[in-house]
Amino acid sequence: MSYKIGSFNVRNLSFGAAASRDLDMIADIIKEFDIIALQEVLSEGKILEGSPVKDVSGQAIAYEHSLRSRLGSNWDMCWLDPKTESKWYPYIGNDSRGEGFAFLWRTDKFKCPVNEKGKEVRPRIYRQYRTDSSKGEMKLIRDPGYGRFQLLNLPNAEIRLITTHIVFGKPSEENLSKEIDFGAYTMRQNEFNVLARSIYTSISDDYNDVNCVVPYTIILGDYNLNLQESGAVSPYVPAVTVIDSQKRILETEFDYPDKGVYFIHTKQTNLSTINKDSDNYANNYDHFTYDRKTEFSIVRGAPCRLNVVERAGGYKNYKEKVSDHIPIMLEIDLK
């Protein structure tokens, strides 16, 4: 049975901005997937379910301006807040937007697993990872969202999704807890290295759940990095990241020991952002990343962007009413 997994940066989507955005079109896009990760969902995710208010009429209005009212009851959803006050994180500034992630999934296809205490394991922010300061790594500006999803027809198979929005610009020095002697491009690449080397490998290796026999792990989101094959300019994300048994990134695909190696592939070469000043595509920032087991076992075809710009009436209208990013899709098949 095939399943469609999506990633979509919805560009500062908030409950307050609902009047200026085409929620019907955004909901129609979401319906093309079985499960989707959203980036740049603001204001505590109120746009998902509606803003909680006391009076009945206010509740009705809030519901009308939500994605829930357009998706229906066969969707579950969860908003995640990556903000932290920990002293170990480099960014100490104040993001007044309140940017977060969201997972939305069809309840007739997926469910959250249950732990040994009988409690549902809902998506969460993933913070349990290590960084290598000798390689310029730090804690991420935004820790990723992490969701475990079991298939209803294959309860022992599990899809593990790690959604990310890699930092675009280096924060100003007054908003950093430590001095950084590299620029924004290197910071983006370092963040990807943390995601691949530390977070992906740890989540992929976790077989400690009695209810999970086969986990397939996928990073998805807005990397703010291009694949060179896309034709977009640098900074680049490597098409293949090779990691040894000590979780060190190797320089080339051929410089590795015989055992304990991760080959992690980053896919999706279509341009997926719209140019700020003209009506055309700009960058190839949105990707999926997964290991060879996942690629050879369940992936069907090449990931791609959805052709939604024409549906919206052109670049300008899409950019104003929907987003400056195009949703991307990965199709998998499990039997």
Locate the predicted segments by residue.
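N-terminal, active-site-proximal structural segment of metallo-dependent hydrolase catalytic domains
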Residues: 1-101, 159, 193, 214, ...
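Short, flexible/disordered intra-domain loops and linkers
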Residues: 45-59, 90, 174-179, 230-241
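Metal-dependent phosphoester-hydrolase catalytic domains
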Residues: 108-115, 139, 201-218, 224-335
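Extracytoplasmic mature domains of secreted/periplasmic and thylakoid-lumen proteins
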Residues: 79-138
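A solvent-exposed, charged loop/short amphipathic helix patch at secondary-structure junctions
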Residues: 169-193
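Beta-strand-turn-beta hairpins that frame and shape the catalytic cleft
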Residues: 1-5, 107-112, 131-135, 139-175, ...
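A Trp-anchored, charged/polar loop motif used as the substrate-binding/catalytic surface
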Residues: 20, 129-150, 189-206
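Active-site metal-binding loops of divalent metal-dependent hydrolases
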Residues: 10, 41, 166, 222-224
